[in-house]
Structure formats: C-alpha cells, structure tokens
C-alpha cells in the first residue's frame, strides 16, 4: 500500500523562493484581516464575483461550459440545468457554497471528501457520485501519430480508499503537530490527492475545492474574494507542467514536490496582490468619490484592452449600470477609446 509520512517534511530544506513566497503571503494574511474589518461592502461584492469566476474557470479547465448568461443564472440559483454540463456546473457551485459557509465544520477525512464528491455530481446521472473509482484511470496523451502514451499511472481502485484515509490522517497529524507551515503542507496534500486520482470523474475540480477548504481552515481567505480557480485556468499550461515535474517517481516516494509547491504559492500570492490592488483602488478614490472617479482611476492603471466586465471585477463597490455610465462619459471626454460592439465591446486608454 502507498504510504504517506508528512513528518519527513520537517527535515527538508526549502529554497529561498519558497520561503519568500511564504513570508509574503503571511504578510498579506495580516492585511486580509484588516480588509475584513474595514471593507465589508467591497469584500461582499468581490465574493459574488469570485463565485461566478471560480465556478466558470474550474469547470472550463475540464471542458465543461455554458454561456455567460446561463452561468450567472445558475450561480445565483435563478434557473435549473438544461444539460449535463450545466448539471456539473450547478454541483460545483453547491460545493463551493458549502466550503465558503462551513469550512470550519468540514474535517479533512475520507468520508467528508466522499460527501463533497457526491454533492459535486449530485445533479448528474453518474452512478459513481460520492464513491471512489472502480476502474483504473491512467492519465494519457495521444500523439499526432495516434499513438497513446501514459503520462502518469495513479493508484489502482483497490488501493484508493486506504490511501485517501492515510493521506487525510497524515495531513491532520501534521497540522496538529505544526510539522511544517500550512502553505507548504497544503500543496503537498493536493499533489498527493491528484496522484491518487481517487475518482472516476471530478478529480481536478475536487482538488481545487479541497485547496480552498484547506486554505480557509488555515486562515487564508483570499480565495473567497479573488478566484484562485481563474488564476489557475489563466496559467493552465504552467499548472500541468508543474504537476508533471512534481509527480515523477511519486509511487516510489522519490518525487520532488517543489515545482508544484512553487506554482501553487505563486497562485496564492498573485491573488493576494490582486485583492490589494482592488482594495487600494477604492481607497485611492476616497469615500466621497463618484462612480466616475473610481472608474477613471481604474482605467488610468490599465494596460492594453479591457472590457466592462473587467472594470466591474476591479471596482467591487460599483454596480453594472454605474460602470457603464462612467465608461460612456470617459469615451465622450476622449480619455478612453471604445472598439467593437455588443458583447465584443472593448476599451483602452487613449495614448498621447
């Protein structure tokens, strides 16, 4: 049976890049607590935006898609699913809500992971929802010649239940005994989870939901306000490259998890920086600022083209109509240029 022993992490040497990531994220964690006290309105708006982006991005990575309008309706519980993709999207939204609202009541145990998987596929007809895999699930790649090569071979179905149980026990023990910083431990757990590949379907989505769960339980809440799933989707190639480097010789216990740890810490840090940028924009505009002032300050800091949706995400204190009116005024004043029409409308700063 594959065994896990996180006590060995205590004796490992972590390079300066990882230690710098950890130190910077820890500093942002302190700012996060200040934001939660002083910026509740802006953060509430960011939560709603992040939910939509997280649900969209995590599913899109797996090729599960719907229209923007349908996605928003599904996330806001204003419609019912029309097809299998929408059934899976709705399931993700439900688990995301559970993690957001009850993270402190969800221990890292095998039976809870199974329950979350059951919720993920709750609206589908899949018979394996909430159950560990019953068939092998090699990770393959098909070459242009048509030849199929095996990139990674996860654990066999019969090994999976005990492996997940052991993995969860080791994680909880490492957290309780403070063996290593949670920011280093969490990516290790997620890497091992992905290498086990415990389900017939939904492993990637479950790994991202569990990442949020573990981060929240350790006091890092940036994923509530800035979509970590979107950050991963935007760097998908780097994600898979880091995973492939980190899973080499995993079964023998001789793999090097550092590439995946660095990638995940980079994602967390980028999300914290994004959060700070959005909060600072509201502070820079001032309490008496109008929607026009806030949007103008946002556009001044943009590089290249941006959409109304981008402005809405970056100005969490404003509604859609306020942003639209501000953009219209800025176009009329010649401060920004509008291109395209309808859904393809884009804006950019007017250069000298």
Segments and roles (model prediction):
Residues 1-352:
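FIC/Doc superfamily catalytic core
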């Amino acid at each position: 049976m594959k065994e896990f022993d996180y006590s060995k992490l205590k004796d490992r040497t972590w390079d300066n890049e990882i230690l710098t990531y950890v130190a910077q994220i820890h500093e942002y964690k302190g700012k996060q607590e200040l934001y939660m006290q002083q910026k509740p309105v802006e953060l509430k708006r960011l939560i709603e935006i992040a939910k939509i982006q997280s649900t969209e991005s995590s599913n899109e990575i797996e090729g599960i898609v719907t229209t923007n309008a349908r996605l928003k309706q599904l996330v806001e519980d204003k419609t019912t699913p029309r097809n299998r993709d929408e059934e899976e999207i709705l399931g993700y939204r439900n688990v995301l809500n559970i993690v957001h609202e009850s993270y402190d009541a969800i221990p890292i145990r095998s039976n809870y992971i199974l329950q979350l998987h059951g919720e993920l596929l709750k609206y589908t007809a899949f018979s394996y929802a909430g159950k560990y895999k019953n068939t092998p699930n090699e990770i393959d790649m098909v070459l242009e010649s048509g030849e199929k090569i095996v990139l990674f071979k996860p654990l066999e179905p019969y090994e999976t239940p005990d492996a997940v149980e052991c993995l969860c026990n080791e994680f909880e023990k490492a957290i309780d005994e403070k063996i290593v910083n949670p920011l280093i431990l969490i990516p290790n757990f997620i890497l091992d989870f992905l290498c086990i590949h415990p389900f017939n379907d939904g492993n990637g989505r479950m790994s991202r939901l569990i990442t949020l769960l573990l981060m929240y339980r350790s006091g890092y809440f940036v994923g509530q306000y800035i979509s970590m799933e979107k950050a991963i989707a935007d760097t998908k190639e780097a994600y898979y490259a880091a995973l492939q480097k980190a899973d080499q010789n995993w079964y023998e216990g001789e793999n090097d998890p550092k590439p995946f740890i660095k990638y995940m810490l980079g994602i967390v840090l980028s999300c914290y920086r994004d959060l700070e940028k959005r909060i600072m924009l509201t502070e820079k505009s001032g309490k008496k600022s109008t929607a026009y002032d806030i949007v103008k300050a946002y556009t001044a800091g943009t590089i290249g083209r941006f959409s109304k949706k981008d402005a809405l995400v970056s100005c969490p204190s404003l509604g859609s109509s306020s942003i639209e009116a501000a953009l219209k005024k800025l176009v009329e004043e010649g401060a920004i240029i509008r291109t395209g029409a309808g859904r393809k409308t884009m804006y950019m700063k007017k250069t000298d």
